[in-house]
Amino acid sequence: MTVEIRFVDEAVAEVDDAALWYQQQRDGLGLAFLASLDRALELIRRWPRTGGLVDDVAEDLEVRRVPVHRFPYFVAYLVRDADIVVLAVAHERRRPRYWSGRAEQ
C-alpha cells in the first residue's frame, strides 16, 4: 500500500528556505539537503510509524518526527488513516515546537 504524503504550505516554505540557505553556503549542498529529505520522506512513506512520537500535541493526533540525515533538521508529520501530512521541516535547535499548532488545523 502506497501512502500519500502531502505538505502544509508552511512546510513547503521551510524546505525551500533551508535548501536555498545550504546552497548559498556551498554549491551542491542545497541539493544534498533535498536528497537527504527525500530519503527521510521515503522512509516515512514505507513505514509511517517509524518516527518517534512527539509529546505536547493533542492526544488524539499521532504526530511523529524523523531526522534528516547529515543535517540538523527533522520532518514532523501527522499520521492519518489515508495519508501523511508533513507539518514542518524544522531545525532541531531553533524555535522548539513552533509548528505544533499546525497539527490541529
What positions do the PLM features span?
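Enriched for short, Lys/Arg-rich terminal
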Residues: M1, V68-Q105
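Arg/Lys-rich, positively charged N-terminal/basic patches that mediate binding to nucleic acids
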Residues: M1-S36
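Generic structural signal for secondary-structure transition and capping sites
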Residues: L20, D27, E42, R46-R49, ...
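Short alpha-helical segments used as structural interaction elements across diverse proteins
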Residues: Q23, L61-E62, A90-E92
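Short, hydrophobic secondary-structure boundary micro-motifs
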Residues: L31, G52-D55, Y98
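Basic/aromatic recognition patch in beta-strand/loop cores that engages polyanionic ligands
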Residues: R39, R46-A82
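Generic alpha-helical structural context detector
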Residues: R39-E42, A88
